[in-house]
Amino acid sequence: MRRDVNGVTKSRFEMFSNSDEAVINKKLPKELLLRIFSFLDVVTLCRCAQVSRAWNVLALDGSNWQRIDLFDFQRDIEGRVVENISKRCGGFLRKLSLRGCLGVGDNALRTFAQNCRNIEVLSLNGCTKTTDATCTSLSKFCSKLRHLDLASCTSITNMSLKALSEGCPLLEQLNISWCDQVTKDGIQALVRGCGGLKALFLKGCTQLEDEALKYIGAHCPELVTLNLQTCLQITDEGLITICRGCHKLQSLCASGCSNITDAILNALGQNCPRLRILEVARCSQLTDVGFTTLARNCHELEKMDLEECVQITDSTLIQLSIHCPRLQVLSLSHCELITDDGIRHLGNGACAHDQLEVIELDNCPLITDASLEHLKSCHSLERIELYDCQQITRAGIKRLRTHLPNIKVHAYFAPVTPPPSVGGSRQRFCRCCIIL
């Protein structure tokens, strides 16, 4: 809020007179003021620091800077800013996000590691200047590190994982997605020193083979979350080892791992009863047989991405409707064998009335308005995707909305092709083509 006083615009932090601020400082003890300041975000703290010398000291006290997220300022953050923050915060800092801060490199992060040895959560996602030298610094100075995000730090190699293994034994969550220089040797070194890992994100680590998963399965019994999206060399052999060694697994993403078969679904059903999230988009070898075993054994499933699992039929939906009462999000896009009958079972199933929130049916050519009728009873349904479902009509969507007025329906209806010109010589285009 700003006011105009004698033609001069002032922020609310500049509206205190010296006497006002003096009264506050006199009435409230320093400890209480510090406690109040501890609830303020970075921007507000910086504004408070400009009110007076006393408030400058309070606002910039290291105890107020235990959690810092600089994502909103990513374009402006350079190495010297991180160095200054680390010197001011010191041992108080527990959580820092530098996500997207392209100007931050190894030298600044070495200073940070030296000064902030109690750091527990650090995000360097997208900090592309970061190399193995940073992980060496973290290993040397930050033994309390629990969560580390290095996604898209493409210079990271096996040396980083070896360093983390040696110096960060408390590590529970590591994201090295798109660090495509990492191989099975790096994973082997990591898990031998960080056996308490609970979440491992390996999306786009295209050099990883089954051998890497065998190391994880053998050394990470606490693993809860594993993301292997587009790890194209992974097969049943490696993932079965994960299932047998990581019984606490709750979330698995294997989307794009096109080599896997029903053997994985059987292994999950037999070994991972706590599974809540399964993403297997574009895994075209999976069938109803595997999903039947999965559904009958994993009753806590909440989210399933089955996009382009082209062999599944209504049989899978029948099993999910019977055995998975907690299902909230289901993607069936490009599952072209799904029909209205499968949606009918889902709409009458255990999850329908209170749980199901999102269903995606893009490019399901056999789906008609009858499916929308079956989904009317899903009172928690928030969103439905119907792109390129050519038998769905506007009238069917309108009827669905009368029962579920707050639902978001994403659909597309091709514009009508304009009539030919009188002379008949003009080429006909649909409206989309004309616009383009």
UniProtKB/Swiss-Prot annotation:
Pfam families linked: F-box-like, LRR_6
InterPro entries listed in its UniProt record: F-box_dom, Leu-rich_rpt, Leu-rich_rpt_Cys-con_subtyp, LRR_dom_sf
Gene deletion effect: Altered electrophysiological synaptic activity, with increased frequency of miniature excitatory postsynaptic currents.
CDD domains listed in its UniProt record: F-box_FBXL2-like (cd22115)
Subcellular location: Cytoplasm
Tissue expression notes: Highly expressed in brain.
Domain of life: Eukaryota
GO cellular component: cytoplasm; glutamatergic synapse; presynapse; Schaffer collateral - CA1 synapse; synapse
Chief localisation class: cytoplasm
Residue positions where Phosphothreonine is found in the record: 417
Residues annotated with Phosphoserine modification: 421
Ranges for domain F-box: 22-68
Segments annotated as LRR repeats: 74-100, 101-126, 127-152, 153-178, 179-204, 205-230, 231-256, 257-282, 283-308, 309-334, 335-363, 364-388, 389-414
SUPFAM superfamilies: RNI-like
GO biological process: behavioral fear response; regulation of protein catabolic process at presynapse, modulating synaptic transmission; regulation of synaptic vesicle exocytosis
Keywords recorded for this protein, A-Z: Cytoplasm, Leucine-rich repeat, Phosphoprotein, Repeat, Ubl conjugation pathway
PANTHER family on file: F-BOX PROTEIN YLR352W, PARTNER OF PAIRED, ISOFORM B-RELATED
Function of the protein: Substrate-recognition component of the SCF (SKP1-CUL1-F-box protein)-type E3 ubiquitin ligase complex. Isoform 3 regulates neural transmission by binding and ubiquitinating RIMS1, a modulator of presynaptic plasticity.
Assembly with partners or alone: Interacts with SKP1 and CUL1.
Entry protein name: F-box/LRR-repeat protein 20
Organism expressing this protein natively: Mus musculus
Designated gene of the protein: Fbxl20
